[in-house]
Design a protein with these regions (language model features):
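Conserved beta-strand-loop surface patch within small alpha/beta domains used
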Residues: 88-146
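Short HxH-centered metal-ligating active-site micro-motif
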Residues: 122-206, 214
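Short beta-strand segments
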Residues: 111-113, 135, 162-166, 243-246
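Accessory alpha-helical/coil subdomains and C-terminal extensions
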Residues: 243, 247-258
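N-terminal secretory signal peptides
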Residues: 1-17, 31
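Polyanion-binding loop/helix "lid" in catalytic or ligand-binding cores
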Residues: 193-241
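N-terminal export leaders
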Residues: 18-38
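C-terminal segment of N-terminal export signals and the immediately downstream linker at the start
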Residues: 39-82, 88, 92
Length: 258
């Protein structure tokens, strides 16, 4: 994932036939803190965690990343495979499926939006047993979402939480439009807008406001997670990292939001 984004807001373009076919195939078959390059601390060419016989804490062949840095590198490598059309679709084999009947040890929790264009397992090229995925429109938090996120680190020692926003987020767009017009949205959708509203960037106008608010919302959600005492204790002793990131629909790049 890239550390910082220099490009301004770009409307999402219609996917090409090749991309649509790839998405269908993936769905049916189925970065620590770098500067200017990938989400991982290692350079953009860094390889994913090397396969080897099953390691302690795993039930299948690929070694489970056990530190925040390893987890970030694996996500960065997976996103690189995705955006360059070199997906490996890992951890889908019959032996993996069988091994997972005895337990799971995902190496990252990804809190993402419900948007159908941003499925975490695909954009990070991961497979069964690799990720806890928690999805709510605009990455909005409530008690159920918080509990779902905390389960990985607190119960299974998952070393990484990623708050993943994305370009052209409909929930953020709706929240900004409701704020500007004063129009109330249907009941449950209004709740989402109310949660996003404090993060609206009023220093920008038009599409730039939506774009900036997408990033501001990710930062706010990440900060709230980092303030949770049980999670903060794990961050403090190095067992956990909580990072914000953003997926660009036009380039398929995931980059870090500082």
């Amino acid at each position: 994932m890239n550390a910082d984004r220099s490009a301004g807001p770009t409307p999402a373009s219609s996917p090409t036939p090749a991309r649509r076919a790839l998405l269908r195939a993936g769905l049916t078959g189925a970065a620590a803190l770098g500067t200017g390059v990938a989400l991982a601390a290692a350079p953009a060419s860094a390889a994913p965690v090397s396969p080897r016989p099953a390691a302690a804490g795993t039930a299948y062949g690929r070694r489970r990343p056990s530190t925040p840095a390893e987890a970030l590198r694996e996500l960065a490598a997976g996103n690189r495979r995705w955006r360059t059309f070199r997906e490996q679709h890992p951890d889908e084999a019959p032996a993996v499926r069988q091994s997972l009947t005895s337990g799971q040890h995902p190496f990252a929790v990804v809190l993402g939006c419900i948007d159908s264009r941003v499925p975490p397992e695909l954009v990070f090229d991961q497979g069964l047993g690799d990720l806890f995925t928690v999805r709510s429109a605009g990455e909005v938090l409530d008690e159920a979402v918080l509990g779902s996120i905390a389960y990985g680190p607190l119960e299974l020692d998952t070393p990484l939480i990623v708050v993943l926003g994305h370009q052209s987020c409909g929930a953020v767009t709706a929240a900004v439009e409701a704020d500007e017009t004063g129009k109330r949205l249907p009941a449950h959708i209004q709740y989402l807008a109310d949660q996003i509203a404090p993060n609206i960037d009023h220093t920008k106008e038009g599409a730039a406001r939506v774009d900036a608010t997408i990033d501001a919302n990710v930062r706010a959600v990440r900060a709230r997670l980092a303030a949770e005492p049980d999670l903060a204790a794990r961050v403090a002793d190095g067992r956990l990292a909580i990072v914000g990131a953003r997926y660009e629909l036009t380039t398929q790049v995931v980059h870090r939001i500082a």
